[in-house]
Amino acid sequence: MCGIIGLAFAEGNSVAGALVRGLKRLEYRGYDSMGVAVIEPPGRLVVRKAAGKIGEVVRRTGVLSLRGRVGIGHTRWATHGPPNDVNAHPHTDCGGRVAVVHNGVIRNYASLRRELEARGHRLVSETDTELVAHLIEEYLGRGYSFLEALSLLGRVLRGSYALALLHLGEPDKVYFLRYKSPLVVGLGEGVNAVASDITAVLDVARDVIVLEDGEFGWISPEGVAIYRPRGDGGFEPLPPGALEERVKRVEWTPESASKAGYPHFMLKEIYEQPRALAETFEGIIEDPALLRAAGLVAGAGRLLIVGAGTSFHAGLVGHYYLSRLAGILGHPVVASEHKVYTPGVDGETVVVAVSQSGETYDTLEAVREWRGRGARVIGVTNVVGSALDREADVTLYLRAGPEIGVAATKTFLAQTILLQTLSIAAAGEAGRLTSGETRELTGVLEGAPDAARRAILASEGAAREAASLLKGAGSMYIIGRGLGGRLAMEAALKVKEVSYIHAEAYPAGESKHGPIALVEPGFKVYVVATSDSPEVMGNAIEMKARGASVTVVAPSDLQLDTPEGIEVLKMPPTGGETLLDPYSLTPYFQLLAYHLAVARGYDPDKPRNLAKTVTVE
């Protein structure tokens, strides 16, 4: 959830500015403080850090006045110790010769800290990170090289960590170590980089290497070295040619990660959905991995669909289509609850793991635990080379481009169209659909980008108007049946995430079993009416009878018997195809959430207490 970056330039004194630009590209991960460390000539390690927003800290601490070619930077999301200036990264050793930034959680930090303090080290922060600098200091003091110190560190630390480190003894290098926390190396012209995320290095590098668990090494202006541990406790460099084989070219431009004139990333990404859908759909239907994945799903003894947050909701939608089209009764699993299902996992189990970043901690823990019991894994991710990509037997890639806003929008619909396509293919593999029917349904999905485009245009004004009326609301229901109930869950999450209005989603048929007790005059209820469940109008009517303000969001060609007093927002027609309902209906709720946040004075890109990529437990 923190973000780290390290840069080594061949010439100039602009590393501080470049670090700040890279950290700004990591803001989407969530943070409460930031800092940098730079080696200034002729040989001085300088740290500037504080709690607060990047721009504020840069101004307050004089970050841009630092001069040097090599440095590291960090945005912190507090896990050990409150957000304050002392706990902000980077952290240094007793002598001020080693600086470290870290993403992850060190599980055995308490015992390590006690041991270090007993040996005379003075640790000033409450973080689990600071002890890394002191351990390195000890190893160097015993005569080990920095690489040997990193190797020892990897054997001592328990938990997850991506580390970038500076050492005054080698002022042209940034060292790194990675275990269970994402880290990439960027290769540029006259500059090399290491960072939590490809997005952070786009200004300086387009060729990247995704590091694997246990790997460590260094970057300098002239080159990169990567080492891996051996079973005997030693380590070795990657074999000749292996480094070059792992280099991947990134086609994203820096501009694609900017706001492109929109006031917020969230709004930009809502409007990017037609393109993201087109590229994801075109990519998946041409990907040979689709049929491999479909064969696994069709032949599964049991199927688990696992994800967290929005990715879990996409999994619910995928589960709906797998059941309806392929007759496959899978189990949707909230990733943090995966241990409940572990006793039933064996070699007959197939797992569909959904994670936009491919680095979601709970999802990866489920995948690793279940793979250890023989399960085969299909990964669904937006990031090539991510941890999920590497863990999966088969990976199906979103092609949505970078998503910066913390609240997922375009990746939800991209995940949806990918899982719909997988469901159709699995139905074909299972013999539930003929080849002609498979082609016909796949052809229906070709209309998804246009349905989303028209839905966005149809929703903008209505969502803005509704937000102005609802900005003072304290709570609302968003309900639906069948597919609509699943879309309602994602709609409610968006409203909660960015506007801080409590929104509860549940299957509409459950109203009389408890939730309707909260309905009183003026209480807001949204009803998601999908092509499979026009009977949901009965639930809308019973809410209206209790005085609720009811708005039904439905495709314009869905036949509904609507009594007076219930508002119906007519979205683009779907021709009765439930396959197109998500693209006709979801954008309204995304825009409603966005405009509610803005109307209430909140930044929808940076909701409080949340992070884009949750890489810790």
Curated annotation (Swiss-Prot):
Origin superkingdom: Archaea
Keywords: Aminotransferase, Cytoplasm, Glutamine amidotransferase, Repeat, Transferase
A Pfam family of this chain: GATase_6
Catalysis performed (reactions): D-fructose 6-phosphate + L-glutamine = D-glucosamine 6-phosphate + L-glutamate
Name recorded for this polypeptide: Glutamine--fructose-6-phosphate aminotransferase [isomerizing]
Gene Ontology molecular functions: carbohydrate derivative binding; glutamine-fructose-6-phosphate transaminase (isomerizing) activity
Organism, as annotated: Aeropyrum pernix (strain ATCC 700893 / DSM 11879 / JCM 9820 / NBRC 100138 / K1)
Originating gene: glmS
Annotated catalytic residues: C2, K612
